């Protein structure tokens, strides 16, 4: 018996049988060992072959295991285990069977045919569980497809379609695919291309997330429902799994062997199968080693001859990058462009998917949530595409509510923690014997019993709410199951069963569900508070958007409305004087938050003009602090760094071919990460004039294209440019009316900036020079900051009025604005106070009183 003539699979089974015999202390390898080893192989080909021949595989496996337990055992042999006489005879019979069929190698299924002729236990068991010679031979012929076994790996390449593809039509039949709404034109165009005589291979090209794969799933559903032309009826749509094809292909030629087996089976199928290759570009170069062919080249002949009916899908970028380079492959495909659906189409798609997501999460998705998901994702998530980004919002919001349902409500959690705290205290007080402790114990007992009653009431409400939600969820699941059953019955032509379900059971369950929801609503109205949410509304969608982008999308709370109405007062806490500037900025923010501003432009764009140190930069910081409660969302760009022409590339990123192309631009990358921010372009007149050309698009359309060709959204930013232009004029005309000063300054601005740049700015704001009264107020703000630093050391700072007046006097300089005041505070207060602290004159808990007398500042401690 030549074991080298066995196929690899058969050799593996023999080795497994030997191992099995050794493990069970059997002296010989019996036919039962080998048959069980064949049935336990990973790919399960022998098991599926037996099932195809009408054999009950599972009971047969159990019977074989049982028969092995009855075999005699010999302990302590330790030597080589040989083949028994029965098995040797069977293997010879197997060789004969293979020769009859003209095979060059002996395959596993030949052993099954030989085993049927066996007079021993194996043959008896096979016959007992339904094996017949005719059925087994028929099963072998259908698996082989008329092929002879010509190499040792022949078994591995069988049923390649089953191993390396996923049947989409079967998934559609069992209701596992999501419904495909709309996309009729694209599906019709795909069907049209599939019906061509040559080049009948459509490739769906579109941005990621627009629904290319969904179109193929829609085609599979139409084929199952019979809503396709006669030529496509009863065809299968198989999705090729490239990962499975490549996985485990260790040796040269193994991948090609697998792909060849797939193509061979498709050719034998005679056009009854449509192959879907998702991410088509992965075929170009897949499996390519030195001197070997890649998958793309292997597909070309099959595509050209029309043996392979193929639908591809890939993105625009990858199609251009990989497929277009291979002109011979590209010409075999017909392009079908898939555009991003609009907001209305997305709403229709979401309504179609609504039931599936409700069923999965066990929550109710309201119609306002669907509309909000489409509109908010379109407006605020600009770097992705509809409908994918809208579906993500619905999914995440529903998942969040589901998570809330599965965890303990916040109000109960707080009660629980409070009860634990009180019980710990009660145990501690119990050990004390004095009267005060006894009184405290009585109070604690009363408090604990009160909280326990409250907790028990809430627990009852929670249980009732959960049971209502569970009841409606069970009805929904049953409804979904019956609808799938009704569709299957209609397809089979079992109209009696379909009508029973459609006009009997389904309406009955729908009425039951409506009644349950009605009861739930009336129960919710009667019981307050409601402990957990069961609905996804527009507010929940807005929360998800806000969390993902940092943009406040949710409805304004009363507190925020008041905050916006009194915005000027809040900004004036940090910016002294400059009433006109503060008012203009506040108006722009109120316009945008109330929803009246143009959604395609930034919230506001301003040019702040004025002398140094009058509060231009400070107003930007105050604005960032007001909008985001921190200055982290202030993107500050010092335009003096962009004095050369080539420095524009630093703002938007280097173009292709230049060093730093992958890094992105300084401004564009920050805005992509923080789309809701205040952008401060400081000292704008110091930048090269070409920088302003880049800003034109931002100011007009609220977008900028970076060095990598990505569009960055500036629609949720406030853009502020500061400049010292006309500052001398402002100093000279400080006593004049604001409008007069503005007109004079604008004359100088127009000589420096181009008209198209000035024309795109919302407001040019002129900051006037500061007076002595303003400086005194600024001194108070700066001293309060010093007070905060001292408060960390547990000290208080009190500055007398004369000392404050002196500081304002020393720090006042009409040319330099408020900046000299900082230096004055450092020189007059911080420096001497630092010495006093180091000498130990003040300690924690002291109040430091600062007074001015005899020409200098004096510090005294008040304890």
Curated annotation (Swiss-Prot):
CDD domains with a match to the protein in the record: AAA, RecA-like_ClpB_Hsp104-like
Ranges for region NBD1: 159-340
Keyword 4Fe-4S set for record: no
Keyword Cytoplasm appears in the UniProt entry: yes
Region ranges (Repeat 2): 83-146
Alphabetized InterPro entries for the sequence: AAA+_ATPase (IPR003593), ATPase_AAA_core (IPR003959), Chaperonin_ClpB (IPR017730), Clp_ATPase_C (IPR019489), Clp_N_dom_sf (IPR036628), Clp_R_dom (IPR004176), ClpA/B (IPR001270), ClpA/B_CS1 (IPR018368)
Repeat 1: annotated segments: 6-71
Residues covered by region (C-terminal): 770-863
GO molecular function per UniProt: ATP binding; ATP hydrolysis activity
UniProt KW keywords: ATP-binding, Chaperone, Coiled coil, Cytoplasm, Nucleotide-binding, Repeat, Stress response
GO cellular component: cytoplasm
UniProt subunit comment: Homohexamer. The oligomerization is ATP-dependent.
Domain notes: The Clp repeat (R) domain probably functions as a substrate-discriminating domain, recruiting aggregated proteins to the ClpB hexamer and/or stabilizing bound proteins. The NBD2 domain is responsible for oligomerization, whereas the NBD1 domain stabilizes the hexamer probably in an ATP-dependent manner. The movement of the coiled-coil domain is essential for ClpB ability to rescue proteins from an aggregated state, probably by pulling apart large aggregated proteins, which are bound between the coiled-coils motifs of adjacent ClpB subunits in the functional hexamer.
Protein name: Chaperone protein ClpB
Provenance organism: Nitrosomonas europaea (strain ATCC 19718 / CIP 103999 / KCTC 2705 / NBRC 14298)
Taxonomic placement: Bacteria, Pseudomonadati, Pseudomonadota, Betaproteobacteria, Nitrosomonadales
């Amino acid at each position: 018996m030549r074991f080298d003539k066995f196929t690899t699979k058969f050799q593996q089974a023999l080795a497994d049988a030997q191992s099995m015999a050794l493990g069970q202390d059997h002296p010989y390898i019996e036919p039962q060992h080998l048959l069980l080893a064949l049935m336990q192989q990973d790919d399960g080909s022998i098991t599926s072959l037996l099932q195809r021949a009408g054999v009950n595989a599972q009971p047969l496996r159990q019977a074989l295991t049982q028969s092995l337990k009855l075999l005699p055992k010999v302990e302590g042999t330790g030597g080589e285990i040989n083949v028994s006489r029965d098995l040797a005879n069977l293997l010879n019979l197997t060789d004969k069977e293979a020769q009859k069929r003209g095979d060059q190698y002996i395959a596993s299924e030949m052993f099954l045919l030989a085993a049927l002729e066996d007079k021993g236990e194996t043959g008896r068991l096979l016959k007992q569980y339904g094996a017949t010679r005719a059925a087994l031979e028929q099963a072998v012929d259908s698996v082989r497809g008329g092929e002879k076994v010509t190499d040792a790996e022949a078994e591995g390449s069988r049923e390649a379609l089953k191993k390396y593809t996923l049947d989409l039509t079967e998934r559609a039949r069992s209701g596992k695919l999501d419904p495909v709404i709309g996309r009729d034109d694209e599906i019709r165009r795909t069907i049209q291309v599939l019906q061509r005589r040559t080049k009948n291979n459509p490739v769906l090209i579109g941005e990621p997330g627009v629904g290319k794969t969904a179109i193929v799933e829609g085609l599979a559903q139409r084929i199952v429902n019979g809503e396709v032309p006669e030529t496509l009826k009863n065809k299968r749509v198989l999705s090729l799994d490239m990962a499975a094809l490549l996985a485990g292909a260790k040796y040269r030629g193994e991948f090609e062997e697998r792909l060849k087996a797939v193509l061979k089976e498709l050719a034998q199928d005679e056009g009854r199968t449509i192959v879907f290759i998702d991410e088509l570009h992965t075929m170009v170069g897949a499996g390519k080693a030195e001197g070997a062919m890649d998958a793309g080249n292997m597909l070309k002949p099959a595509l050209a001859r029309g043996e392979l009916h193929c639908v591809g899908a890939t993105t625009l970028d990858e199609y251009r990058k990989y497929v277009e380079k291979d002109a011979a492959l590209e010409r075999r495909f017909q392009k079908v462009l898939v555009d991003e659906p609009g907001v209305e189409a997305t709403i229709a798609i979401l309504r179609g998917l609504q039931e599936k997501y409700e069923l999965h999460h066990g929550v109710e998705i309201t119609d306002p949530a669907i509309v909000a998901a489409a509109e908010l994702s379109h407006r605020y998530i600009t770097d992705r595409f509809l409908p994918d980004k809208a579906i993500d919002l619905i999914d995440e919001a529903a998942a969040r509510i589901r998570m809330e349902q599965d965890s303990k409500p916040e109000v109960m959690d707080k009660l629980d923690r409070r009860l634990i705290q009180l019980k710990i205290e009660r145990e501690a007080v119990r050990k004390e014997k004095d009267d005060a402790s006894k009184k405290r114990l009585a109070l604690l007992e009363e408090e604990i019993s009160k909280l326990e009653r409250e907790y028990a009431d809430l627990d009852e409400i929670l249980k009732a709410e959960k049971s209502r939600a569970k009841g409606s969820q069970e009805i929904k699941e049953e409804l979904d199951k019956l609808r799938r059953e009704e569709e299957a019955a209609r397809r089979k032509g079992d109209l009696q069963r379909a009508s029973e379900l459609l006009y009997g059971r389904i309406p009955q369950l729908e009425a039951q569900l409506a009644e349950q929801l009605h009861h739930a609503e009336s129960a919710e109205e009667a019981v307050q508070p409601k402990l957990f949410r069961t609905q996804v509304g527009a507010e929940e969608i807005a929360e998800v958007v806000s969390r993902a982008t940092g943009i406040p999308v949710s409805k304004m709370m009363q507190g925020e409305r008041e905050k916006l109405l009194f915005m000027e007062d809040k900004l004036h806490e940090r910016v002294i004087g400059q009433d006109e500037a503060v008012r203009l900025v506040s108006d722009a923010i109120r316009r945008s938050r109330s929803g009246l501003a143009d959604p395609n432009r930034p919230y506001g764009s301003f040019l702040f003009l004025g002398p140094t140190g009058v509060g231009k930069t400070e107003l930007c910081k105050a604005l960032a602090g007001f909008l985001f409660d921190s200055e982290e969302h202030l993107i500050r760009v010092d335009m003096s760094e962009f004095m050369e022409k080539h420095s524009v590339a630093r703002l938007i990123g280097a173009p292709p071919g230049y060093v730093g192309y992958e890094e992105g631009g300084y401004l564009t990358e920050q805005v992509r990460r923080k789309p809701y921010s205040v952008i401060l372009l400081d000292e704008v007149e110091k930048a090269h004039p070409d920088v302003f050309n880049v800003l034109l698009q931002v100011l007009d359309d609220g977008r900028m294209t970076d060095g990598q060709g990505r569009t960055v959204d500036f629609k949720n930013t406030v853009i502020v440019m500061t400049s010292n232009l006309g500052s001398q004029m402002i100093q000279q005309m400080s006593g004049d009316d604001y409008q007069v000063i503005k007109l004079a300054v604008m004359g100088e601005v127009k000589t420096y900036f181009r008209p198209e740049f000035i024309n795109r700015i919302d407001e040019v704001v002129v900051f006037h020079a500061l007076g002595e009264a303003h400086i005194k107020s600024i001194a108070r703000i700066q001293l309060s900051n010093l007070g905060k630093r001292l408060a960390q050391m547990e000290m208080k700072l009190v500055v007398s009025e004369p000392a404050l007046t002196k500081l304002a006097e020393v720090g006042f300089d009409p040319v330099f604005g408020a900046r000299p005041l900082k230096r004055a505070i450092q020189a007059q207060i911080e420096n001497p106070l630092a010495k006093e602290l180091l000498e130990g004159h003040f300690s924690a808990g002291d109040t430091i009183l600062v007074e001015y007398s005899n020409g200098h500042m004096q510090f005294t401690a008040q304890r």
